[in-house]
C-alpha cells in the first residue's frame, strides 16, 4: 500500500461543502444518534406528506429495513418539478452521441415535458402503480425519460444492461413477471450496431416458455434499419409521443414503495433482483452525490457509467437530477474514434467532475499519454473512480496525467446493494492515499471481522461488514426475502456482510482488497488478486493485468496472470522473468507467478468490467463450458485466450 498522503488542495478546502471538522462532527452524530441525523437530512427532498418515523431497521432474524416509512413523496417530482421555478431553463441533461459530431442539451423544462409525455404513453397502455416495466435501452436520453416516467406513475422499473443476451433478458423478465418492455431498434457503439429489438424478441419467446407473456413492446427508433415487428404487441415511441399530453401529475408514493429492481450479474444461478425503495434511496443518492462530488450549482458533472448498472441509476440519473445538476450521458466508447474521446468530451462540454471506472483508466493509460495531452482538461476540478479497487499505479496516472496533479481523486467503494457510496473520500475533508477508498460516509459503521466473526481492531485485514442500516440500503431481493437474509446476513449474525475483503492501515484508511472469492490460498497463505494485479501494473511495461487462481498439484492454488502490455512493448522471455521478479519484490516470494499469459486484450463487458469467471475457467482448462459470453464487448477475444493458454501441459 502506498504511504504517501496527498493533501487537500487549498482552493478545494476553501470552497468545499464539507471540511474536516464538519466531517468529524457529522459522522459522530450520524453514528451516535442516527434517527436525529437522518431525520434532519431527510428534509433535503420534498415530501407531499412529511414523515414522523425516521428509522425502523433490524439486521437480526428475518431482517427488516424501513426508512421514513410514513412519508409520502415522488422521485420524479424531486428530480424535475421542484427545479422548474428556479432552474427550468438550465440544462438538466447533456447527451453526447456515439457520433463525435452530434449532441443534445435538454433543459429541466424540456425534461419535464419529455417525461410527462412518456409517462402518459405508459398510462395509455395500461401501466399503473406497482407494475414492473423492463427497460432495455442504449445510452440515449429516452433511457432516462423511461426511468423517470416509471417513477412518476409509480411503476417499478427494471433496467437491463443493453449488452446482455436474450437469455439474460428472459431471466429478468421471468423473475420480475414483467409484461411490458421498452427497447430500441438498435444500439450504436463505436463502429458496431447491436440488434436490441432482435434480442428482445428472442427473450420474449424464452420467457413465454416459462409462462411469462410480454404483451407490449415500446420501440424507440435509433437507426433506420428494418426490424422484426409483431402487430398488436409492438409500437413505436415516436408515433405516440406527439399525441401524449405534456402534463402528468406525479403519483403519491409511500417512502417504502418500490422504486426499481436491478439484477446483479452472478456468474451462475438465478439472477438476484435487488429491490430499492423510494424515499430513503433518493435521500441517500442525492446526499452522497452532493457531498462526495462537492457539487456546486452550475457545474457540469459526467458519470460514464451505463444506466444498466447501479452507478448509472444513482449517479447519472437520480442523484444529480435530484440536486438540480447538469448531468452528462455518453452513448459511445472511450476508444472510438480513438483513445482521446473522453478528454475531447471533457473539453467540448467543459466538464468539472469526471467519474469513471478503473478499467477504463488502465486501458487509456496503456494507450499512452499523447491522447490525453492533446486536450486541455482545464475545466476539471474533481476526478472519481467506481466499480472496483483502483491500483496505485493507475490512480497516480489518473491524478498526475489526467488531472495535472491538481484534481483530488474520489475512490468510491459501494455496491448495487448499498444504493450509494459507503467508503469514500470527501474532497474538502479527506487527505488521499493512492488506492485507498479512505473513510466511511455518514451513518456507515464498518467492521472488519475474521472468518469466525471476531471483530478486528486497529491495523488489520479481514472481511468487510456494516453493522447498522442506512437509508439507501436495499430492502430485499425481489420475491425472495429468504435468499436476501441468507446471502447478506447469515454469515455474520446481526451484520450486513459485503462479500469484500478489506485492510485498515495504521491511519485508519480502508483499502478494498477485492471479493472474498478473489482471495487465493497459496500454500496456506491468503493473497488478494487485487494486490497481485497492482504489483503487476506498477511495472512500466504493463498496461492491464488480471490474476486468477488455478489448481496446482503442490500449492493447492497457483497464480495465473493475464497481462496486457503497453503499446509498443513486445512479449519476451526476459520480460516474463522480469515480471515474476517484480511481483516477488513488491509482495514477497509467496506471490511468485506460476503462469503468465501475454494477452493483447482481456475479456470485458461493455461497462468495462473484466469477466474473471471466464479467465478462471481458461486457467483451469475448463473452457468447454464458459457459459454466456454474449455480454462481452468483444467475444472473439476468448478464442485467442484459449489458443494461447499457458497450462496445456497440466491438462495433458
Swiss-Prot record:
One of its GO terms (molecular function) is ATP binding. It catalyses: acetate + ATP + CoA = acetyl-CoA + AMP + diphosphate. InterPro entries: Ac_CoA_lig, ACAS_N, AMP-bd_C, AMP-bd_C_sf, AMP-binding_CS, AMP-dep_synth/lig_dom, ANL_N_sf. Signal peptide: none annotated. Gene3D superfamilies: 3.30.300.30, N-terminal domain of ligase-like. Acetylated. Deacetylation by the SIR2-homolog deacetylase activates the enzyme. GO terms for cellular component: cytosol. The keyword Lipid metabolism does not apply. It is an enzyme of class 6 (ligase). The modification N6-acetyllysine is found at residue 609. Pfam families: ACAS_N, AMP-binding, AMP-binding_C. Mg(2+) binds at residues 539, 542. Its cofactor is Mg(2+). Keywords: Acetylation, ATP-binding, Ligase, Magnesium, Metal-binding, Nucleotide-binding. It comes from the Bacteria. CoA binds at residues 189-192, 311, 523, 584. Belongs to the ATP-dependent AMP-binding enzyme family. PANTHER family: ACETYL-COENZYME A SYNTHETASE, ACETYL-COENZYME A SYNTHETASE 1. This is Acetyl-coenzyme A synthetase. It comes from Bartonella bacilliformis (strain ATCC 35685 / KC583 / Herrer 020/F12,63). The lineage of its organism: Bacteria, Pseudomonadati, Pseudomonadota, Alphaproteobacteria, Hyphomicrobiales.
